[in-house]
Amino acid sequence: MAKIIYLPLEHIDMRYTVYLDKVITNYLESSKIEFIKIYPNIPKREIKEGSFLDAPTTIEFKSKQIAKVAEMYHTDQIKSGDIIFTSDIWFPGLESIAYLNYFCNKEVKLTGFLHAGSFTDTDFVRDMERWAKNFE
């Protein structure tokens, strides 16, 4: 039976990320859906005033999630039919899933929420459209 590999956002107390992870985890558990949650242990760092995240910490967190996913492909813990779900698809490095699917000869689906992006005029990542539009 297919399972979900859940890649949550890192917890940032002043944002919605802790609540969102709790809601998603509770739903998966109460629905008795088989899932593996990949939540790397990284040190909490202070977010600079005027920012809503710390970019280096975010990239470290997501990179460790992708590294764990790659290990799971290598050890055949991820199988065709499984689903990788992320609570935010705006996730640099997520294109690695297509790479892993191709070279590991697996059909693993990728899904998740896309809260905003370079296509959103009011989002700060609008300035990243030059490279982000092909990623999104």
Predicted regions: what they are:
Residues 1-96:
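N-terminal pre-catalytic "stem/leader" segment of glycosyltransferase-like enzymes
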Residues 59-63, 104-108, 136:
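Glycine-rich, flexible loop segments associated with nucleotide phosphate handling
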Residues 29-32, 108-112, 134-136:
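Glycine-rich loops and low-complexity Gly/Arg-rich segments
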